[in-house]
Amino acid sequence: MSGYLNSAALRESDSSQAWHKVLVDYLYPKSATGYATRPRVFADGLAIPLGILPYKNGFYVQHCTEIVFLCDTDGDGKADKREVILSGFGVQDSHLFPHQFTRAPGNWIWFAQGAFNYGKVKTSKGAEVQFDQTRMARFRYDGSDFDITSQGPCNIWGLFMTMEGETWITGANDYGCPAMPFRESGNYTG
């Protein structure tokens, strides 16, 4: 696993596979020492997939202007089905495309977007929502609903939710407060 220590981030799925955010591969199988013996590619050809969330037999991933669900339907460990969940995200600020995908109560997935992206997000039902600059938002697993939940702070770099539902965010410019409690409909400076 030493080749993955400098990655943007790792996520672990329910089946204890570690998912690498940049290469979208997983470490398999685990040896007796608890370390993975080799990476296996689940999906490739993705454009800067900063947002990733393992879920059931696949994962949600941000790919260019879309959030897609890639899944393995035949059990071979590779994505063979692709479903567009949301589309229309801005791609002007590549270092903070939609990211920090986090499961939340009420069957939502929460995420953040960077400061200089401008887009009009389209749901699976065809509704469109203007989604500009730094924002936190949430969407349903099937893409049927999409809501903006806050504005700012400048470039959200971290999102964490406790088991009790308390949510914390961190920003690139912490303004003396490296971690902030997140409040829906909040307007954060920066």
Regions found by a protein language model. Give the residues of each.
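Beta-propeller domains with acidic blade repeats across secreted/periplasmic ectodomains
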Residues: 1-190
